């Protein structure tokens, strides 16, 4: 795969910005996508749901929409439903798959039911009792826990507590921090102290596996987007059989959720060499630090051609 087939599109709208905590990242992604598509002689405009009216989408006479929104509205099925109603083809998964993927616990349950390994954990709220927290520590805290919002992305609101730092007090503080991002649902999961990987899926097929080598395992929001301290290995230095197994698991994870177009799946390696899948990103970042473009480059696909490939897969849920 070295060349992107240019879709027969002339007028495209890039959806960017939005109202989520990932707004600034979305604007960075949108800027890159707009420049790339314009370089391919497409007429490109932008639409920001935080400031622009729905009428602008309806009246734009666009051939397709490239969704560069992240988080609420952009990845939860909301904007996908709107675009279905308008009849405007869009990039990425449809309404149902997007809504499911936004819910980390529901996603894990579906994956687990389909034989895909995921971290053990429990879903709580900020109102969880001390007894519930103590039970979570007893059941999942042998090596520490990871506390995260049930629906947010970009590692926002995530706290990692290793075994020495884990206590009722520290878990309560982490729970409250995550609940500030997602009052409805917080996940407390086992802390898997292993290598971190991500796999981009394009049209149902995995691109080369990327290993994320963050300082002290801290692949947080700041390190993801605003520093150069994280090192990446692409393709990851894994035995061939392990890389194939991880890629196959991620392709299956994409398929069983009913995804289409593109996505990115995050995973951790367990001590026994197997992998636990963490979550799926249905509108992956396209910033200068983003990982899908990195994986695409490894197979000879430029940023601009990647944008065209993704755009060429634009669909609606309505036949």
Features from the language model and the residues they span:
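Active-site nucleotide/adenylate-binding loops and adjacent lid/helix of ATP-dependent enzymes
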Residues: 2-16, 44, 100-187, 193-194
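A short glycine-rich, hydrophobically flanked beta-strand micro-motif that places a catalytic Asp/Glu
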Residues: 45-50, 186-190, 260-272
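Phosphate-binding site of ATP-dependent enzymes
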Residues: 168-248, 269-276
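ATP-dependent carboxylate activation and anion-phosphoryl transfer catalytic cores
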Residues: 2-7, 113-115, 239-319
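Short, flexible, mixed-charge acidic loops at enzyme active sites
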Residues: 78-85, 218-226, 282
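Short beta-strand-to-turn element immediately C-terminal to the catalytic PLP-Schiff-base lysine
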Residues: 124, 158-165, 201-203, 270, ...
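ATP-binding N-terminal substructure of ATP-dependent carboxylate-amine bond-forming enzymes
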Residues: 1-109, 113, 124-135, 312-319
């Amino acid at each position: 795969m070295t060349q992107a087939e240019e879709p027969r599109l002339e007028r495209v709208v890039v959806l960017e910005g939005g109202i989520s905590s990932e707004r600034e990242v979305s604007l960075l992604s949108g800027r890159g996508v707009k420049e790339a598509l314009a370089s391919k002689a497409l007429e490109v405009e932008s639409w920001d749901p935080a400031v622009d009216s729905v009428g602008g989408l309806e009246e734009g006479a666009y051939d397709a929409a490239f969704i560069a929104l992240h988080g609420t509205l952009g990845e939860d099925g909301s904007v996908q439903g709107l675009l279905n109603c308008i009849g405007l083809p869009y990039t990425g998964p449809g309404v149902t798959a997007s809504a499911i993927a936004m819910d980390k616990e529901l996603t894990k349950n579906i994956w687990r039911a389909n034989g895909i390994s995921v971290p053990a954990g429990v879903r709580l709220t900020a109102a969880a009792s001390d007894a519930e927290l103590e039970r979570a520590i007893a059941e999942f805290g042998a090596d520490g826990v990871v506390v995260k919002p049930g629906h947010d992305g970009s590692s926002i609101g995530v706290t990692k507590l290793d075994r020495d730092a884990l206590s009722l007090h520290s878990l309560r503080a982490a729970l409250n921090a995550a609940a500030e991002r997602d009052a409805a649902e917080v996940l407390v999961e086992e802390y898997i102290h292993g290598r971190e990987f991500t796999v981009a899926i394009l049209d149902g097929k995995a691109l080369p596996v990327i290993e994320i080598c963050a300082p002290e395992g801290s692949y947080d929001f700041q390190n993801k987007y605003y520093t150069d301290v994280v090192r990446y290995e692409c393709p990851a230095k894994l035995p061939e059989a392990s890389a194939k197994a991880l890629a196959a698991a991620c392709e299956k994870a994409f398929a069983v959720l009913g995804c289409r177009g593109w996505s990115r799946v995050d995973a951790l390696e367990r001590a026994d060499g197997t992998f636990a899948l963490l979550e799926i990103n249905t509108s992956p970042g396209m910033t200068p630090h983003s990982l899908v473009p990195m994986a695409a480059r490894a197979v000879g696909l430029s940023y601009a051609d990647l944008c065209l490939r993704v755009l060429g897969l634009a669909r609606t849920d309505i036949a």
